Amino acid sequence: MDQSKPSFFITTPIYYVNADPHLGTAYSTIIADVQARYRRSAGYNVKFLTGMDEHGEKVAEAAAKHGMTPQEWTDSQAPHFKELWSKLEISNDDFIRTTEPRQHHAVQYLWERMKESGYLYKGSYDGWYCVPEETYFTETQVTKSDEKNHTEGQHLCPDCHRPLERVQEESYFFKLSAFQDKLLKLYDEHPDFVEPAFRMNEVRSFVEGGLNDLSVSRTSFDWGIQVPFDEGHVTYVWFDALLNYMTAVGYGVDTNEARAELAYRWPAQFHIVGKDIIRFHCVIWPAMLMAIGEALPEHVFAHGFLTVRNAETGKAEKMSKSRGNAIAPQDVIDMLGVEGYRYYFMTDVVPGTDGAISFDRMEQVYNADLANSWGNLISRSLNMSGKYFDGCAPAKPASFDAFENPLAKIADGLVERYMAKMDALDYGGAKDEVMELIHAANHYIEDSEPWALAKDETKADELAFVIYNLLEAIRIAAHLLMPLMPQTSAEALRRLSCEDEAASDDLKGICAWGLLAGGQPVEKGEPLFPRLG
């Protein structure tokens, strides 16, 4: 493993396999993928982890409904996730499954460490449990139904509003209550541990309200990782699932290679999660790590839900199959293509908040940004270059001060502005920086009128200057859009005969103005973003 570069370790949640992957799981994964691609281009040695959460009562129930064993069911689901990630150009370096031997070994090692820590004890759990959410609730946290579609007085999950199960069983408990002050100190000393900031406020408020010890083993079913020192118990699904992040970088493996990887990779720089699992990642997970003396992840970024507008009420609603308003990833791919899909969800939906989506808005963004602006710039510029310079780019100007050069002025400092936005996962803001250059280049065409310059032999140098600047703007924009749209950006570079640049890991260096060689063949090609509608 090359450790000459700084490590950047980013993760998605590992996804439940009770159903096929949907827009929400794809959303989390593309957020992480864009960051991973960006960090590779900026010189980091990236490890990008995703995977499947295969244990727990919810998965066992889904398997039973399909007439399969839990292992058969999870084996049947894995290809659905891998196929969608491949289709969406996800560049993960690892795909972990919690049924793998490496996870079993790591979880059993965790149990031994927890036992040694003194933060584990055996007791009896008597309370409420939500199978769909895989979450325990106290009597004060639950609600009682007065809705017509539930039995009156029935205990409902405060998160998903489905009926709860009453659970009474012997269990091992993790002393989560012992970490209230330690967690609050963490939030004080590292205010960016949870992002966006308003999510940190939610987490802090929850912890300030007091923490109960957490039941971390189950005895009422057997689909899980066995507790090594008590064969009648299996591991609570979240106690298992959260550890996957460390399992993937060698936790608990007693070899020099594994220890070196763990030292290099851990802690993770970013956990990307949905807001519905923020307490597990920002309360339980850091407390677990504190208990066993391991470093904490640097940032947990919690994105919002994808919502759709109810045609009758006009209100935004969370997508769900039960409401009949769910949109399948393939529906969006069929409309926008993969690159348009990635672009829309990463730039028009603000990651930290809930985002209302619609096919009308998708078409509007695609046509305005990709077809009319970016795609149009590529087509017009390459067409003029080929037409006026015999299928090639013009020679590189001897001086960039010979004529007015508005594009070079915008490009000055562009990479730094873009990187600041990308570092903060503000993909919409980063896109705006690039689109400023693209819009300026389109205006530059209208203002400089290359077609008129081409008719005047005395303007040959100015024509070459204008076309070169347009091609150079395309080259730089392609590099900056690469994390969002890897295939079309690489294709834009190929049409400029700059395909070797696509693998660059020096983003600042490669985006310096004036690196286009000049004189090389260029290709207009088919439109990269055909207009919709």
Explain the meaning of each model-derived region.
Residues S117-Q180, L184:
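Cys/His-rich short segments
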Residues W128-E133, G304-V308, R361, P394-A402, ...:
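A glycine-rich phosphate-binding loop feature that marks nucleotide/adenosyl-phosphate handling sites
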Residues D94-H105, G123-Y136, M200, A302-T307:
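Short, glycine/charge-rich beta-strand/loop segments that flank catalytic centers
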Residues V350-T353, I357-R361, Y366, S381-A430:
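Long, amphipathic alpha-helical stalk/connector segments used for oligomerization, subunit docking
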Residues A371, G375, A408, D412, ...:
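Generic structural concept
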Residues M1-S7, G51, G123-W128, P132, ...:
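Basic, alpha-helical terminal appendages of large translation-related enzymes
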Residues D2-K122:
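N-terminal Rossmann-like or analogous alpha/beta NTP/dinucleotide-binding catalytic cores
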Residues D2-T50, R102-A106, L156-K387, D432-V434:
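Structured secondary-structure scaffolds
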